[in-house]
Amino acid sequence: MAIHLYKTSTPSTRNRAVDSQVKSNPRNNLIYGQHHCGKGRNARGIITAGHRGGGHKRLYRKIDFRRNEKDIYGRIVTIEYDPNRNAYICLIHYGDGEKRYILHPRGAIIGDTIVSGTEVPIKMGNALPLTDMPLGTAIHNIEITRGKGGQLARAAGAVAKLIAKEGKSATLKLPSGEVRLISKNCSATVGQVGNVGVNQKSLGRAGSKRWLGKRPVVRGVVMNPVDHPHGGGEGRAPIGRKKPTTPWGYPALGRRSRKRNKYSDNLILRRRSK
């Protein structure tokens, strides 16, 4: 990904650094509209996910996370921008006439061929079960449940590593640093997700953030006591508590939020690194 810097004509462009976006001209049969209502509200209209609302209209692209076109070679026709994710997507034309979108693997170019199956080459963009991969393979779009489709390592630049295979399970090191077990029958795609330099982007101004549907983040200490436990006081006052809390009074900033006695606790060999 190439980072595009603007001329310093205004303060907003002076601080702006964006990726040279690939143009998007999606196929009509691979997109559908979304009706976003509530913007972070639940059925009662109460905010449950903050700082959401507005933003430009989007069309959702149907991404093939399952890669179930087995043993049929496909060719990368386009590399497109997807407003619903940081990663780019590829349009694949398969030999049987099927057309699908997949996540763009790093280094893949237009004209490359990909295939999914059980005995396919260990090549960037190919999808196959973990049991057929050698140790040390870099992978992404990893299934947790066989046949459900990839759920892990799908963000831009994400990559996991196959570090061991024993019995019916394979040991993976995920992008977060977590080491966990996954069934060897689950599939994954070889390689790393593209658009690695996405963290080098700088939007430069607040309006660009609003286009993405992100609203301003207001600190609780500058609110009134009726709005937040940190609010109130004369002038710049501290939060008035031993530890910070959420707007609803629950402990924040450090308390573990993972559900206890979750079924996957036995599958996690090492927690993610903070």
Swiss-Prot record:
Q: Which GO terms describe its molecular function?
A: rRNA binding; structural constituent of ribosome; transferase activity
Q: Please report any disulfide bonds recorded for this protein chain, giving both cysteine positions.
A: none
Q: Which UniProt keywords apply?
A: Chloroplast, Plastid, Ribonucleoprotein, Ribosomal protein
What are the GO cellular component annotations?
chloroplast; mitochondrial large ribosomal subunit
Biological process, per Gene Ontology: mitochondrial translation
Q: Name one Pfam family in it.
A: Ribosomal_L2
Against Gene3D superfamilies, the record matches this protein to:
2.30.30.30, Nucleic acid-binding proteins, Ribosomal protein L2, domain 3
Region (Disordered), start-end ranges: 224-274
Which compartments is it annotated to reside in?
Plastid, Chloroplast
Q: What is its main location?
A: plastid
Q: Does the keyword Cell cycle apply?
A: no
The superkingdom listed in its UniProt entry is: Eukaryota
Quaternary structure, per UniProt, is: Part of the 50S ribosomal subunit.
Family the entry assigns: Belongs to the universal ribosomal protein uL2 family.
State what protein this is by name: Large ribosomal subunit protein uL2cz/uL2cy
Q: Which gene encodes it?
A: rpl2-A
